Amino acid sequence: MQRAWYALLMPAPILPLIEAASRWPERGALIGLDLGTKTIGVAVSDPDRRLATGVETIRRKAFKADAARLLALAAERNATGFVLGLPINMDGSEGPRAQSTRAFARNLAGLTELPIGLWDERLSTSAVERELIGMDVSRARRAEVIDEHAAIFILQGALDRLKTLRGDR
């Protein structure tokens, strides 16, 4: 019986952001993800990890198709890891959305060796929506771009935290 190529990989580690950062090389792009029930917002950092920019919003289909697109984006951009927004409740507990995100991370980890960092995304979508409303973006347009912008928000927050820990100015 022939096994698929991805069955030969060691699963990627899934770690809190700071621990994941210790597994990433010093330079290289990171892929930021905002996981929704219908879409996945995708952002990417520059190789020096200073700035997050939007890439696209993936309309979710089946996990394998979604994962294939994410892995293709990671390969195209020579990414060294993923930052996945973890929707933690305001009281610090993890509800069904966080459990679903962790399950997605476990499944993705089985297909890649790129370390996956989890970053608290509390209120990211709300903050982005307020910003888009402030920019007078129509409701229809907000619906199209909110997940990608949330991914930017999540990844930029993670990059800023890593920058602070490194002592960069």
Predicted stretch roles:
Residues 5-33, 38, 43-169:
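Phosphate- and other anionic-substrate recognition elements at nucleic-acid/protein interfaces
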